Amino acid sequence: MNISLKSKNALVGGSSKGLGNAVARQLALSGAKVTLVARSKDLLVDTVNELNKLTECKHEYLICDYNDHEKYSKIISQYLFNNRIDILINNTQGPKSGDVNSLSIKDYQKAFDLLFKNTVYTTMLAIENMKKNSWGRIINMTSVSVKEPLSYLALSNSMRSSVISWAKTLSNDIGHNNVTVNNILTGYFDTERLKELNSDKAKSLT
C-alpha cells in the first residue's frame, strides 16, 4: 500500500531504537516530517542524519528521559507550543519487570508516570492543534498484555491497560473533531527490550 503523508508532522516517542525507530523511519519514508524523541543523543543523531539523506524533509529530534516527568514535561510542552503535530506516536521503554510480590508502591508510581502520565500529558497538549486543524492521528504503542496479562510484567500489565481504557474514552470525546485514537497491541519482536525481559525472568528462576 502506498501511503502519502506529505505536509504532515509526526512526533514519535522512544524512537532511537526498536519498534519506535521502525515506526519513525516508515513515517519519514511515507513523506512525513518526523521528530524523534528518546534519551540517546548519538542514536537519535544517526537516525535523523540518515532520514534527512533519504527523504526531502528536515527531520528533528528531542532528547528526553521519560523516567523524569518534570524535565520531560518542560521539554515536550515547549516543543508542542511552537510546533504543529498531526501524528502522535506514544511509545516509551517499559517499566521495571517483576511479579506483584516483588514490587513496591514506589515502583507503581514510577510506572504510572512513565506509561500513563506521560502519555496523557503529551496527548492533551498535541490535541489542541489537531482540533483546530480538524485532523489528527494518535497512536499508542501498548502490548498484547492488555488482553492477557504476561507473567513477571505486573507493572506493564496494569499501566498499559489504563492507557487502553483512557484512549477509548478520549476517542469518544474527540472523534467529532476528525481526530482518531488507536492502540497497537505489540507482541514479541526481537528487540533489546525483549532480550532484557527474558534475561530478568531467567534470573528470577535461578
What are the residue ranges of the model-derived segments?
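Conserved glycine-rich cofactor-binding loop
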Residues: 9, 16-17
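Conserved glycine-rich Rossmann-like NAD(P)H-binding loop of the short-chain dehydrogenase/reductase
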Residues: 32-46
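Substrate-binding pocket helix/loop in short-chain dehydrogenase/reductase
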Residues: 99-100, 104-112, 194, 202-205
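Active-site helix of classical SDR
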Residues: 123, 159-160, 167
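Alpha-helical segment proximal to the catalytic Tyr-Lys
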Residues: 128, 172-173
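Residue(s) in the substrate-gating loop at a strand-loop-helix junction
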Residues: 143
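A glycine/serine/threonine-rich, flexible loop-to-helix segment
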Residues: 176, 188-206
